Amino acid sequence: MNDDLIYKIKEKKEILKDKITILAHHYQNIEIVKLSDVIGDSYKLAVEGSRSKSEFIVFCGVKFMAEGAAILAKDTQKIVIPDMKAGCPMAEMIDAIRAKEVYERIREGCNKEVAPVVYVNSYGDMKNFCGERGGATCTSSNAKKILEYYFNQGKRVFFSPDYNLGINTAKSLNLKK
């Protein structure tokens, strides 16, 4: 980031004062972090954005993170993402249209109810897809508990999009292929 851009951002922050809050994910470069009001993971940033009294929330992260912040934001807040091309390869592995196709195929081949579970680092359409079908979102730290919950109800699970998290969680539960 060049000095001119840094100066312009500082200038706008000074003009807008409490009307703007800049949120930055941990992985942002140091120049952005220094300009930010809050630094954290996607969940912390979404929550802190919603707690802010600012009208404008600038979310320095990827699209699904800004989308999560927008879900929690007050009606009076506008979430802005500086780079609309800032995507997450994992979140883009599947969308609700493809998930529905796969989910239906799994249901057809299964003699049990299927609960969709999506890793929280996903777009809103996937989270909505899960909620509409009695599923859930999970984090890497609670994936095992979420899967156990559905398995204890006698259900099967359709897990996406984090393949490795799904496989490693299945192994930790001693599930067969």
Model-derived features with residue positions:
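The feature marks the mature, well-folded catalytic cores of soluble enzymes
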Residues: M1-K177
